[in-house]
C-alpha cells in the first residue's frame, strides 16, 4: 500500500555528512555537499528535501548534524539556498521537530539558535520573512528554550563588599575547624565523627545556600542535574569556587567570557553585583550569574564513595583484558565453552560502562586543567627568562668619579703692567730646565703700560732661551724639541733708570712670570711712549729674545734685547757712546748703541757706562779725553761680532769707536765672513740670517708696548736686503756692514 519515497540525488551525500556514528562534524563531507549545490542550478531545492528527511530521524545526533549542514549551505551557496531555507516546507519541519516533546532539549535549543541566526541574515530581504515568522512563533510557544537575558552590570556597593568579606572570613573559619577535626586522634567516638560530618555539611549550607547531607547526597545531586538552579544573587564569590554553565553564552562586550553549556568555570572574584570573574580554558573574563549554577565542593563521604567506585572499575580491568585476548586469539572455530565465557565477560564489562564513562570525564577534565596550568607555567617562565636576559644584557653603567677641573692658566701678566705681582694660581710642574733661583728684591712698577694685542706673550713657567759660553742653554734645546712660538720680554720705557748688572732678572725664581727687581738711584721722569718699529716680513724674528750670563754665581741671567746675538760671539759697544738718560755715574740697564748727534731725538744725553755682553762685570769707561777727529754726522754702526774665543771684545769695540774708518772696515770683513747664525730661529722654525738687519719687536710682559727707537737713516741710503722696505741703516752699510742697532732701554 505504501511506497517508499524516491531517493534524491543528494540523499547519499547528506546521509554521509549526518551519519549517526560520527563523533563530531565531518567537515570534509559537508564542504563536498556545498560544492555540489553551488554548481547545480536545482541543487538547493534537492538538498533541502534531503535535509527534511534527515530531520525526521529519531537520533538526536543526526538531527544536530543536519542543522549544521543547513547552516553551512546558507553561508556558502548564495541567495537560492536562502530562498529554499525560508520556504514553508523547511520552516514547518523545524517547528514540528521543536514542538515535539520527545525531541532532545539540546536539539530544541539548537533549532531556536539557528532560526535566530537565519532571521538576522535574511532580514534585509522581505521575500524571506517566513523565517522570522517561524522563529517568533517558536519563541512564543517555548519560552524556556530561550536563555535568560544577561543582568545589568551594577557596581558593587560597600555593603556588598562587606558582606563578601564576612562570608569569606566565615568560610575560612569553617575550613580551619575542619582541619582541626582531621588532626584529632583516630580513636575518637563515632558520635563525634558523625557530628563533625554533620557540621561540615551544614557549613556550606549556611554560607552558600547549598543543601547537602550525608544521607541524601545522591538524591540531591540527581535533582540538581534534572532541574539546575542558577546561582542566587545573594551568594558571593568568596564561598564559591566552581560553577557549571547552564546555557551557551556569547560575549557582547569586550572582557566577557564565552562558554558553552556544561562547561565548568573557576570563580576568581566578584566584579559587579550579578557578574563574576572566572577562568575557563586559559581565558579570563566576566560572566552572568543567571547562566551558571553553583557546584558544591565534595564532602568526605562523596570523596570516599568516588574512590570506592574507581577501585571497582580498576578491579574489572583484568576481565576486560581477558575478553580482548579471547576475541583476538581464536584462530580456530569458537568453542561452546569459550562462547559462554566471552558472553559472561561481556556482561561484566557492560556493568562498569557508566562508571567508566564518569571516570573518563573526570580525568579528561583534570587533564585539561593540568594542560592549562602547564601552559600558564611555561608562559610565566618564558616571561621571567626574557626579563632576566634583558637585565643581564643591559647592566647598569659604571659610576664615574667627578674630578675637580684645573683652573685655567694665564699666559700673560695682569693689567698691573711691569712689576705687577703675578696672580696666585696652581701651575703645572715645569718640564724643562730651571736655572738658578732668583734673588729677592723689591720690584719696580712700570711707568705706563699699554696693551698691544698684536704681540704674543710667552707662557708662564717657560724659560727664555739664552747662551752660555758659546753653547746652547736648556731653554734653546727645549725650543728645538717643541714647536717654536714667539716670546717677549718686558722693556722699560725710554729713559727708565738702569739697574746694575748684578741685579738682573733670573727666570728660575719662584715666580717665573714676575719681572726682576730694579735697583734705582733716582725717580724716573715720565717717559714718552713711542710706537715700536716693525719691518714687514720680519715678525718671526722680532719676537726672539736673548739672555746673558752674569757673574753672580755663574748662573745664567736673562737679559731682554731686541737684537739676535750670536751664540759664539758677543757684541761690544763703545762705552763712551752708550746713551742713558741717567747721570753718567748711574749704572745702565740697557745695552749701549753708538752715539748720535745732539739734534737726534734718539741720541744720548750724556755718556754713560755701557753694559757689556762679556762674561764678568763691565769694565769702567776710559777716563781719558775723547779721541780727536771729526764728529760723525750719523750714529756709528756697532761693532761686528768677534770670532769664537775672542779674548776681549770690549777693547775691540773701544778701538773701533775711536777709529771710525777702521771700525767700518772691520765690520765689512766680519759681515762678509758670516752668512747666518746657527742655532737662532725665527717664529716659523727656520734659521735667521744675520746678514739682513732685523728690526726689534715690541716686547710687553704686561700688555703694554714699550718704546722702541728707530735708527737714523741718512737720506738716499739703500734699504736692508730682504726687508722689502727701508729699514735701519748706518754709515758704511753700502760697504757691507750687515749688523743693526740695538734699541736702548
Swiss-Prot record:
Main localisation: membrane
InterPro entries linked: ENTH_VHS (IPR008942), GAT_dom (IPR004152), SH3-like_dom_sf (IPR036028), SH3_domain (IPR001452), STAM (IPR050670), UIM_dom (IPR003903), VHS_dom (IPR002014)
GO molecular function, one term: ubiquitin binding
Disulfide bond positions: none
Region (Disordered): 142-237, 390-745
Keyword Cell inner membrane assigned: no
Gene3D superfamilies: 1.20.5.1940, 1.25.40.90, SH3 Domains
Keywords: Endosome, Membrane, Protein transport, SH3 domain, Transport
Biased composition (Polar residues): 518-532, 540-576, 648-660
One Pfam family matching this protein: VHS
Transmembrane segments: none
Domain UIM: 163-182
Source domain of life: Eukaryota
Biased composition (Low complexity): 186-214, 425-446, 577-590, 636-647, 662-672, 719-733
Subcellular locations according to the entry: Endosome membrane
Domain SH3: 238-297
One BP annotation, GO: protein transport to vacuole involved in ubiquitin-dependent protein catabolic process via the multivesicular body sorting pathway
One GO cellular component term noted in the UniProt record for this chain: ESCRT-0 complex
Membrane topology per record: Peripheral membrane protein
Domain VHS: 17-146
Biased composition (Pro residues): 618-635
Subunit structure: Component of the ESCRT-0 complex composed of hse1 and vps27.
UniProt similarity note: Belongs to the STAM family.
Function per UniProt: Component of the ESCRT-0 complex which is the sorting receptor for ubiquitinated cargo proteins at the multivesicular body (MVB).
Protein name: Class E vacuolar protein-sorting machinery protein hse1
Native source organism of the sequence: Neurospora crassa (strain ATCC 24698 / 74-OR23-1A / CBS 708.71 / DSM 1257 / FGSC 987)
Amino acid at each position: 500500500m505504501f511506497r517508499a519515497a524516491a531517493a534524491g540525488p543528494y540523499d547519499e551525500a547528506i546521509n554521509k555528512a549526518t551519519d549517526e556514528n560520527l563523533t563530531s562534524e565531518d567537515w570534509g563531507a559537508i564542504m563536498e555537499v556545498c560544492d555540489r549545490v553551488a554548481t547545480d542550478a536545482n541543487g538547493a531545492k534537492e538538498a533541502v528535501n534531503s535535509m527534511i528527511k534527515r530531520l525526521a530521524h529519531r537520533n538526536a545526533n543526526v538531527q544536530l548534524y543536519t542543522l549544521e549542514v543547513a547552516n553551512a549551505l546558507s553561508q556558502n551557496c548564495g541567495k537560492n539556498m536562502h530562498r529554499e531555507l525560508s520556504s514553508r516546507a523547511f520552516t514547518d519541519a523545524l517547528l514540528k521537530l521543536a514542538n515535539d516533546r520527545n525531541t532532545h532539549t539540546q536539539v530544541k535549543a539548537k533549532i531556536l539558535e539557528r532560526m535566530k541566526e537565519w532571521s538576522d541574515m535574511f532580514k534585509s530581504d522581505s521575500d524571506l520573512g517566513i523565517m522570522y515568522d517561524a522563529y517568533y512563533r517558536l519563541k512564543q510557544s517555548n519560552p524556556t528554550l530561550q536563555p535568560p537575558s544577561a543582568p545589568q552590570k551594577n557596581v558593587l556597593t560597600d555593603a556588598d563588599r562587606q558582606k563578601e568579606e564576612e562570608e569569606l572570613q566565615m568560610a575560612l573559619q569553617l575550613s580551619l575547624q575542619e582541619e582541626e577535626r582531621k588532626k584529632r586522634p583516630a580513636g575518637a567516638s563515632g558520635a563525634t565523627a558523625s557530628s563533625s560530618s554533620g557540621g561540615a555539611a551544614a557549613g556550606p549550607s549556611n554560607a552558600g545556600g547549598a543543601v547537602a547531607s550525608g544521607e541524601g547526597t545522591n538524591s540531591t545531586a540527581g535533582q540538581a542535574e534534572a532541574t539546575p538552579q542558577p546561582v542566587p544573587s545573594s551568594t558571593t564569590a568568596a564561598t564559591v569556587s566552581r560553577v557549571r554553565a547552564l546555557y551557551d553564552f556569547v560575549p557582547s562586550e569586550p572582557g566577557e567570557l564565552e562558554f558553552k553549556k556544561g562547561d565548568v568555570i573557576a570563580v576568581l572574584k566578584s566584579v559587579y553585583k550579578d557578574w563574576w570573574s572566572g577562568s575557563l580554558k586559559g581565558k579570563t573574563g566576566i560572566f552572568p550569574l543567571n547562566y551558571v549554577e553553583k557546584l558544591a565542593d565534595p564532602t568526605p563521604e562523596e570523596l570516599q564513595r568516588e574512590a570506592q567506585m574507581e577501585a571497582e572499575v580498576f578491579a574489572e580491568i583484568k576481565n576486560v583484558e581477558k575478553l580482548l585476548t579471547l576475541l583476538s586469539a581464536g584462530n580456530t572455530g569458537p568453542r561452546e565453552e569459550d562462547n559462554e565465557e566471552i558472553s559472561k565477560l561481556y556482561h561484566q564489562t557492560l556493568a562498569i560502562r557508566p562508571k567508566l564513562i564518569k571516570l573518563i570525564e573526570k580525568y579528561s577534565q583534570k587533564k585539561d586543567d593540568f594542560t592549562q596550568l602547564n601552559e600558564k607555567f611555561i608562559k610565566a617562565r618564558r616571561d621571567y627568562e626574557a626579563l632576566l636576559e634583558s637585565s643581564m644584557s643591559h647592566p647598569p653603567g659604571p659610576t664615574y668619579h667627578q674630578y675637580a677641573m684645573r683652573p685655567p692658566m694665564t699666559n700673560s701678566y695682569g693689567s698691573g703692567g711691569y712689576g705687577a705681582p703675578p696672580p696666585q694660581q696652581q701651575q703645572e710642574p715645569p718640564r724643562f730646565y730651571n736655572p738658578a733661583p732668583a734673588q729677592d728684591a723689591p720690584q719696580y712698577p712700570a711707568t705706563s703700560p699699554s696693551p698691544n694685542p698684536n704681540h704674543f706673550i710667552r707662557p708662564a713657567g717657560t724659560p727664555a732661551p739664552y747662551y752660555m759660553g758659546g753653547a746652547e742653554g736648556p731653554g734653546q734645546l727645549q725650543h728645538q724639541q717643541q714647536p717654536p712660538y714667539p716670546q717677549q720680554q718686558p722693556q722699560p720705557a725710554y729713559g727708565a733708570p738702569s739697574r746694575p748688572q748684578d741685579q738682573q732678572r733670573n727666570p728660575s725664581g719662584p715666580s717665573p712670570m714676575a719681572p726682576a727687581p730694579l735697583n734705582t738711584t733716582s725717580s724716573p721722569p715720565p717717559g714718552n711712549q713711542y710706537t715700536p718699529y716693525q719691518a714687514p716680513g720680519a715678525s718671526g724674528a722680532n719676537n726672539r729674545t736673548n739672555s746673558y750670563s752674569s757673574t753672580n754665581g755663574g748662573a745664567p741671567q736673562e737679559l731682554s734685547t731686541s737684537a739676535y746675538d750670536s751664540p759664539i760671539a758677543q757684541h761690544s759697544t763703545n762705552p763712551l757712546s752708550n746713551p742713558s738718560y741717567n747721570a753718567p755715574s748711574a749704572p745702565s740697564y740697557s745695552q749701549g748703541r753708538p752715539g748720535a748727534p745732539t739734534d737726534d731725538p734718539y741720541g744720548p744725553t750724556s755718556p754713560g757706562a755701557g753694559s757689556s755682553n762679556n762674561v764678568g762685570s763691565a769694565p769702567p769707561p776710559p777716563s781719558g779725553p775723547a779721541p780727536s777727529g771729526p764728529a760723525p754726522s750719523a750714529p756709528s754702526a756697532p761693532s761686528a761680532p768677534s770670532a769664537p774665543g775672542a779674548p776681549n771684545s770690549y777693547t775691540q769695540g773701544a778701538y773701533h769707536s775711536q777709529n771710525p774708518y777702521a771700525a767700518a772696515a772691520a765690520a765689512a770683513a766680519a759681515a762678509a765672513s758670516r752668512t747666518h747664525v746657527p742655532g737662532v730661529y725665527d717664529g716659523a722654525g727656520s734659521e735667521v740670517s744675520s746678514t739682513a738687519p732685523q728690526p726689534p719687536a715690541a716686547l710687553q710682559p704686561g700688555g703694554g708696548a714699550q718704546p722702541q727707537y728707530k735708527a737714523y737713516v741718512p737720506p738716499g741710503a739703500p734699504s736692508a736686503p730682504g726687508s722689502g722696505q727701508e729699514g735701519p741703516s748706518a754709515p758704511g752699510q753700502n760697504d757691507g756692514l750687515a749688523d743693526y742697532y740695538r734699541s736702548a732701554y
